[in-house]
Amino acid sequence: EAVRKRAEEVGALVIVDEAYHYFYSKTFLKEALAVPNVVVLRTFSKLMSLAAVRLGVIIGNPELIGYVRNARLTFDANSIALLFAERLMNRPDVIDGLIRTQQEGKDGLLAELDKMGYWCRDCRGNFIFIKPRHNAHEVSDRLEKMNVLVHPYGNQLLKDFIRVSTGSKTAMSTT
């Protein structure tokens, strides 16, 4: 609220990235629809594991949306991606099923890692942070040789952790 008010005072735009909105129930949609300087960005790629689709939505004041529309490329999304999104938005049962499947896989992985004594952080997305027992970059390199891709970090706050993307129980148990 304080950020929104300050942005309004100075005429700035507040952009809320809700890329992981399927995994976290709090949203700024009401603000984006009611407050002229707030927009929400969402993507379809996180829940569907379709990063290559590169399709998302922007929700906000019609005037701001108009500026975005004027600045975008003529063919900024392919027709298959648009059809996919349109059909998906009309199938909340499919979305709910994907959320459930994703959560079951994440919960199973967290339970197994807890049994093995690892410190993990359940994040509000399709990933978790794990503190490995050895250097995070070395662990990442060893896992990559086994065709398991995780993401180590270089910054001071996260250098001791690896980020592991999560999926269905089947996907999480094949490694």
What are these regions (language model features)?
Residues 37-114, 118-121:
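PLP-dependent aminotransferase class I/II
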Residues 52, 124, 157-160:
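Short acidic/glycine-enriched loop/turn segments that link adjacent beta-strands
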Residues 1-47:
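Active-site pre-lysine segment of PLP-dependent enzymes
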Residues 60, 130-134, 166-168:
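Short beta-strand-to-loop capping motifs
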Residues 5, 142-151, 155-175:
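PLP-dependent enzyme catalytic core of the Aspartate aminotransferase-like
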